[in-house]
């Protein structure tokens, strides 16, 4: 603290820049096309088998095991209208949020609709499990630390989301959190 009181304006600015860069490194997400392809082909097949196994009446039927996860997901509403909106600009999806599965289900539904993937903020708790973290880190999720209350952190987070929108990355925002 003594050092801060006697620091020059330039030194203070450098320190502020370092803190902002550290916050940005904590927040930034990644998107890997290979992981996306795996997530939209292999994983849905496995989930479909699990969902079918939960229905004892369907276990005896080989055709029910071959059905895809898309048979378990219903997409209703103005899908064509959403596609037309995408032609006009960046898509921002703002649904209600009730569980940690919401971003997974919405991401898969967006894929089934033939739309490009969405970037989205996710709480740090979703990065605790190594398997979940791998997918979150490679499917466009950026980290949101809800415990950080510093104004600078919130500004860096807001700027990250703003720049993503300005660069035409489609986004998913859950205003209510979980």
Which residues does each PLM region occupy?
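Conserved Motif II region of HX4D acyltransferases
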Residues: 89-96, 157-178
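Glycine-rich, histidine-containing beta strand-loop boundary motifs that form or position
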Residues: 95-97, 107, 121-124, 175-177
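Catalytic core segments in nucleotide and nucleic-acid processing enzymes
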Residues: 143-159, 171
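Structural beta-strand/beta-sheet cores of well-ordered domains, especially the beta-sheet scaffolds
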Residues: 71, 89-91, 116-124, 140, ...
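Metal-dependent catalytic core segments for phosphate chemistry
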Residues: 108-112, 116-148
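Acidic, metal-coordinating catalytic cores used for nucleic-acid/nucleotide bond scission
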Residues: 126, 150-153, 178
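Membrane-anchoring hydrophobic helices of lipid-metabolizing enzymes
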Residues: 1-92, 97-108, 128, 133-139, ...
């Amino acid at each position: 603290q003594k050092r801060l009181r006697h620091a020059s304006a330039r030194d203070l600015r450098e320190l502020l820049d370092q803190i902002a860069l550290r916050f940005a490194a904590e927040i930034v997400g990644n998107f890997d096309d290979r992981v996306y392809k795996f997530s939209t082909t292999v994983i849905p097949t496995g989930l479909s088998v699990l969902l079918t196994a939960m229905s004892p009446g369907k276990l005896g039927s080989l055709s029910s095991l071959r059905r895809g996860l898309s048979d378990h997901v219903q997409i209703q509403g103005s899908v064509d209208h959403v596609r037309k909106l995408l032609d006009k600009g960046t898509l921002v999806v703002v649904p209600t949020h009730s569980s940690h599965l919401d971003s997974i289900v919405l991401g898969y539904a967006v894929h089934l609709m033939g739309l490009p993937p969405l970037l989205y903020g996710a709480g740090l708790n979703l990065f605790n499990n190594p398997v979940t973290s791998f997918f979150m880190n490679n499917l466009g999720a950026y980290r949101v630390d809800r415990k950080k209350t510093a104004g600078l952190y919130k500004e860096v987070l807001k700027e990250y989301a703003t720049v993503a929108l300005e660069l035409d990355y489609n986004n998913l925002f859950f205003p209510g959190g979980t």
